[in-house]
Each structure stands twice: as structure tokens, then as C-alpha cells.
Amino acid sequence: DEVIHYMNSRAKEPKPITGAAWVDGKVYLRLAGAKSAVEATAEKWTGEVMEQGGQFWQQLQHMQHEFFAGDEPLWRFSVGSTAENPDLDGPWLIDWAGSQRWYRGEADIAKLETMAQRAGGQVSLFRGGDRTDEVMHHQPRALKEIQQRLKKSFDPDGIFNPGRLYSWL
């Protein structure tokens, strides 16, 4: 939670920060913009400059970082950036200054949904794991109805990815 606070406090500063992530116990901040602003910020903030920084951020964006490899279930939490991290043992990767969090490990989706809701968000089983039931965060009836009406208006014949996200959509 200290890391989440740190990333969010940096993101609030009037600096050219365009990315904030926590991977393998390290915080990564991406700076981009006017050269003078980037240099001034890099000089003021402590840390190291990554030689392959562009490659690192691209790997995160396209889920090609080694964290995303492997057979263990991969869960994606989309939560409030300042919310406490759910109390789960196992590897985590935190991106978007805390708004997107990835967890690797076996878990019960109902338990994870409760944790995600407490953090102001949702969770989905992104890859692997038991896919015999819903893998996306369960939706309340009102949201289901809205999504079904939207789907019907954009795809009246139901030919585009039926049941891909939800069995009822």
C-alpha cells in the first residue's frame, strides 16, 4: 500500500509522468514530454534511467512481460488507484498507478469479486484457470439489462462473439 500511495502522489505532481507501475518489487515511472521538463523531473526525482525503458513499457502494454507468462491463472483487477491492495498471497503486478492490478494464482472468483468491490472496482479471470463458469465480474441485473440492450442494438442477429464475455450476452 506504501507503493500505491507513492505512485499516486507522484502522479498528482505537475510533472510529465505518463506511466507508473510496480513490478518485481520495484517502482517504474515513465516520463515523456518536453525535453527540459523530463530532464528537470528526472534530476529532481531519485532513481535510475532504464536503457530499454520503451521496450519495458511496451511489454507491459501488450502483456508480453515475463509476469504474464506461465500456466497459473491470471486475474485482472480494475480498481480505484488509491485502494488498498487485496490481501492475497502470490505474485502481483501493479500498473496505471494502481488502477490496473494483475494477480497470479488460484482463487475463488466470488472471493475476488468481494475484494474488488471493496476496492471500488471489478475483477476478471484474464487467462488460465477454471473457465467452466463466468470469468468476468458478475453484474447486477440492471447492468446486465443495459448491456443486453446495447448488444441487441449493435448486433441484432447476435453474430459477434456470442457468450464470449458473459454466457448471457
What are these regions (language model features)?
Residues 24, 47-169:
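Conserved glycine-rich FAD pyrophosphate-binding loop
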Residues 1-71:
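C-terminal substrate-binding/cap subdomain adjacent to the FAD-binding core in PCMH-type
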